[in-house]
């Protein structure tokens, strides 16, 4: 059983605050990354989960604005430290969060407890060998498209686990890997693209939401 006390004993953390639809969320992040990096191969399994990506912030806001339906099941893959699923659950969605990295899962569980979502289902999921029960009305993910070797497992997972007529939403900043995967998706999915721009005093970042449904 997960223990918040044991979590604090195991990890050094810092807290980031996010405000979504006037509601504050306090999210624990690793204070240092060195313990999660292999010094002999820094690019292998780099802890991409250990920060809140702008795409995750945009996806969280999208789900907060989406009318919840208790009869619909949502699934998040590659959930990292848990922001998206925590926001979705807070705004009434029935969502299951999944992640593969064990440390990320611990942070997600801690964040769920801190943000009054102790009953949020948080599960380990290997995209290459998924063990999900049933199908989902909506599958969401943010910034999961980096490695070409993940493309085929992702497509198989989506096709196997989205309900007929269900939707998949992928959020990411614009990069080449996303464009490559977009080309692969087009043969199996109808795709609608929504662009969101996050602006600050110093810059602007465009985040793309790929909204996809399996072709008939």
Segments (PLM) and residue ranges:
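S-adenosylmethionine-dependent methyltransferases
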Residues: 1-216
């Amino acid at each position: 059983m997960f223990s918040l006390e044991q979590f604090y004993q195991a990890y050094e953390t810092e807290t980031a605050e996010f405000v979504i639809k006037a509601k504050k969320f306090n999210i624990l992040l690793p204070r240092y990354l060195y313990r999660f990096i292999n010094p002999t191969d820094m690019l292998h399994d780099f802890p991409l989960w250990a920060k809140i990506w702008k795409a995750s912030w945009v996806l969280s806001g999208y789900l907060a604005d989406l009318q919840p339906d208790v009869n619909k099941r949502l699934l998040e893959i590659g959930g990292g430290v848990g922001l998206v699923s925590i926001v979705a659950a807070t705004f009434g969605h029935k969502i299951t969060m999944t992640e593969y990295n064990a440390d990320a899962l611990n942070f997600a569980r801690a964040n769920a407890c801190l943000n009054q979502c102790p009953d949020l289902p948080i599960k380990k999921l290997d995209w290459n060998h998924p063990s999900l029960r049933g199908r989902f009305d909506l599958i969401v993910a943010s910034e999961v498209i980096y490695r070409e070797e993940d493309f085929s497992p992702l497509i198989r997972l989506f096709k196997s686990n989205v309900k007929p007529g269900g939707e998949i939403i992928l959020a990411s900043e614009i990069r080449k890997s996303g464009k490559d995967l977009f080309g692969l998706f087009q043969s199996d999915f109808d795709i609608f693209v929504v662009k969101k721009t996050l602006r600050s005093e110093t810059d602007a970042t465009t985040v793309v939401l790929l909204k996809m449904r399996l072709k008939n």
